[in-house]
Every structure is written in C-alpha cells, then in structure tokens.
Amino acid sequence: MSGDMEAKIWGSTQISVKEFCYEWTISNFSFCMGGIRRKIKSPVFSLVANEEVAWCLRVHPNGFDEESKDYLSVYLVLVNCPKRQVRAKFEFWIKNSQGEKYQYTQSLNVPSFQRKQNWGFSKFILRDSLLSHRNWLLPKDKLTLCCKVSIVGAILNMPGQNMIPAIKDPRHMLTDDLGKLWENPLFTDCSLLVAGHEIRAHKAILAARSPVFRAMFEHQMEERLANCFEIQELDFQVFKEMMDFIYTGKAPTLHSHSMACDVLAAAEKYGLEGLKVICEDSLCRNLSVENAAHTLIVADLHSTEQLKTRALHFIAVHASEVSKSSGWKSMVESHPHLVDERFHSLASAQSVFLESSFKCLKGF
C-alpha cells in the first residue's frame, strides 16, 4: 500500500485546566510573630464569584512544627468543595519591592485536595532571610504572598477530524526576552574584558540593574570612550552567572559552596542586592561542619548579618564537630576576632547550653 493510500487514524485527549493567581498582602507583618504553629489565614477566594469551590492561604510565621521553626511555612487550603476531591497544582512566591518574583516554589506533582485539607511547604523561606531584608522583601512591613492554582477539570477525548488547531499563546515573559539579548550579541554597545574573555553587553541594561556599572559608564574615562571595560578580580564563570542574573533576574547555578561565596562577593561589588540575598540564602541552606567556619568569614567580610547569625548558631550547636574541622583551625589563625569578639557576644545572649559550647570552641 502506498503512503498516499494509508489510513491515518488519530485522536486527541484534552485535560481541562483552570488557572488563576491570588495575591495576598499581610500588613504589619513583623507583629505576626509568635510561637510554633501560630497561623494567619487569608480571606476565602474562588476562581469566579459565588463558585462552590473555595480556597484560602495559611501562613505560619514561625514554622508549622519543631523541624520548621526557623522557616516561614505556607499552605493552600481547600475550604469548600461540592465534589469528593479536587486535583490541583500550586505555585508560591513572594512579590518583592520591585514587583519581581522571589522564592518561587511549586508543587512537584498534582495532589488531591479534600475539603479542609491543605498542601504546601513547611520550609518555604528562612525567617531570618525574610526579616533581614525588609526593604526588599517586606516594604513598609508588608508581605505580599502570591499563589497560582491550576485546577484539573474534565478529560475530553476528541477524534482527529473534529480537532481544531490550537492557537498559540503569543505572550512572552520579559525575562525570556531580555535573556535572548544576553545570549545574542546583536545591538550591543560595549565590551567587557574578563579573565582573558571578551563579553559583549548593553550599557542601558547594565546601568539600570547595577549602580556600579552606571557610575562606570558615567565617568569620563578613556575606557568609556572606547566602550571597552576591563573587569578585574572576577572569575569568568562567576561573572557569567552574575550577568545572567542582571539580564533575566533568575537565580544563578550555585553548584558548590565556593561558587556561592564568589557570586556573593561579585553581587556586593556591583551592588546587586537581589543576587546577594539569593547567595546568602543558598549558603544558609547548605551550612555544614566543614564549611561553617569559612561561611562565617565570608559573612563577616561582606557584612551579611543574617548569614553571620545563622553560621554562629550552627557552630554553637555543632561545636565539638566544627572545632575539629580544618576550616575552624584556619579561621582561628587568620580571623581571631571572630572567635574573641563575635562568639563572646553571642554566647552572652544565648542559653547555658550555647555558652558551654563556645567555651569548648574557645579552649580548642
């Protein structure tokens, strides 16, 4: 049988999905702190007015349980539903002072909600990370939490002859479009020399994102006239991660402790507060016995108080193990003030347990 004569039998299965986004603003957020399991509920909301399927958000500022006591816990709650259950995927993020998404987190699967049941994230964001960057994440003491809900609806099977070609959604994300400018050197107007590599870039984007780049372009220097600028003391890969953040706002690939530290240093050098927060949060999440001392040095060097507090607390809790690490021994020799001053001030404000832990460290 020839190809033209073959019968082509095909069909399509369409799973209906309804999506909506809910934005919840909590004013005077700093007054919401309390004990573990203390919760705040949002107003009840629905996809459309008077719909029987109703939801609300729930926040635990001090964590849902003992394990998550250092975090902000967030949940999506099914308040009412006429059916036995609803399957829905959900996404959470914080809207920062610039209107950008921060701490974007989504469900890995599509859980089933029953009436009064909730799903969410017990360790959504470190509370210290949130509070230590108030101007960026809590402008005017307001937390703006966003949740996108995708509800699974009916499953419809359709034969091929009845199929209507789907119209592609023409919308594009701004970050994706700017990312294309970063990937393609078209219309660039300056060159950046980094560790023997030349990178083409756009002055307007760099100046808008970084006050350091803006000042560099404004000054009447020979490099400016030639539109060629040498970037010193930065690793090429670190610089690429920083530039990717400048163009897209997306979190960098921090595949190691040293990379997170190097990108943090670059973020501070070029005035990128958002990138600095991301690196700080990554270092907090990945504290270990081996890197705790070096993390403390980095925190002290770059004046990141939240990271310093977390590192000091980690060292206090794991005093005997940290004191045996090579990083601790190196820190005692190179940064004795962190032992003599910071540890002493922290121990005086902590419990007897912490004081005894630091005595162990001081006597090492």
From Swiss-Prot:
User: PROSITE patterns under this entry?
Assistant: BTB, MATH
Q: Which residues form the BTB domain?
A: 188-255
Q: Which InterPro entries match?
A: BTB/POZ_dom, MATH/TRAF_dom, SKP1/BTB/POZ_sf, TRAF-like
Which SMART domains does this chain map to? BTB, MATH
Task: Choose any GO biological process term that the UniProt entry carries and state it.
Answer: protein catabolic process
Q: Where is the MATH domain?
A: 19-149
Read off the Pfam families from this record: BTB, MATH_2
Q: What family is it from?
A: Belongs to the Tdpoz family.
Its name, as the record gives it, is: TD and POZ domain-containing protein 2
Question: Which species is the source of this protein?
Answer: Mus musculus
Taxonomic lineage is:
Eukaryota, Metazoa, Chordata, Craniata, Vertebrata
